Amino acid sequence: MLLATLFQLFFDIHSWYLSTWCNRPFAGRVRILSCGLVVKRSSLFGADEANIIRYIRKNTTIPVPRIVLSTQGFGSAFMLMEYVEGEVLEHAWRTMDETQRANIVRQLRSYLVQLRGLPPPRAPLVCSLGGTACKDPRLQSYGSFGPFPTVSDFHNHLVHAAAPWIDDIFLKDIRSRMSDDIRVTFTHGDFAPRNIIVRGDEVAAIIDWEHAGWYPEYWEYVKALYRPMGIKDQSWNDTVKNIVPQDYEKEWRLDREMTDYMVGAI
């Protein structure tokens, strides 16, 4: 509890300083320290990001930040981790030539293959690490949700979440076209260029794992293309098809039929 108190005081004082002296009332959840470390504060609801990163670091060669320590308290989870030098891919992608882009794609594809190869401990359970509740901005209006015993239960939840905005007949048609007989694989859940740090044409780190967990195998593809408020880059959208190991265009289009109407999910 002492660590959580120190982190909370740090965020309170730093937020006060930024708001009062720098005219920055909304400073975000991440603070970069001068000692080569980063502090992140997140909600207790849903995934335990620190343990997810430790799990990925232990079981794959995917580059992730090193966690120095983590703790919980005051309704928040705090994580102290190393600062990874580099540029976010969202910015670097626009200036890369075809060879550089191909190198990035090759690395990212190999990392997703590793991620999807992790053995699910309790398949077909759809959940975060350790069988806990899921957290996803696709359904952020509902906070944490799940876990779900099966993929079918997860799909039922997606349809239920869309019910306030979509006619029942239309939803029943969408649900009838969802395939429940698919694998559950470990999924980053927010595999976007803003969460990939590069140095030149080398992937330095993949960050922001708070939405990760065991999801239907198509979910990574759907979420990689889900950016309602972000920069839409068609070249990146096309590239996602070469990064995710299988074709899930059908599942993505089906999900879009719902999300195009779901104002509350955005």
Set out the residue ranges of the language-model regions.
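Acidic, glycine-rich loop-and-strand cores that form catalytic or ligand-binding grooves
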Residues: 122-176
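Plant-skewed but cross-kingdom recognition/interaction modules and surfaces
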Residues: 45-49, 193, 202
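Charged phosphate-binding loop/patch that engages nucleotide di/tri-phosphates or the phosphate backbone
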Residues: 20, 239-266
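Active-site Asp-x-Gly
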Residues: 151, 181, 185-186, 199-249
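Catalytic-loop of the protein kinase fold
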Residues: 186-188, 193
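ATP-binding pocket architecture of kinase catalytic cores
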Residues: 19-140, 148, 183
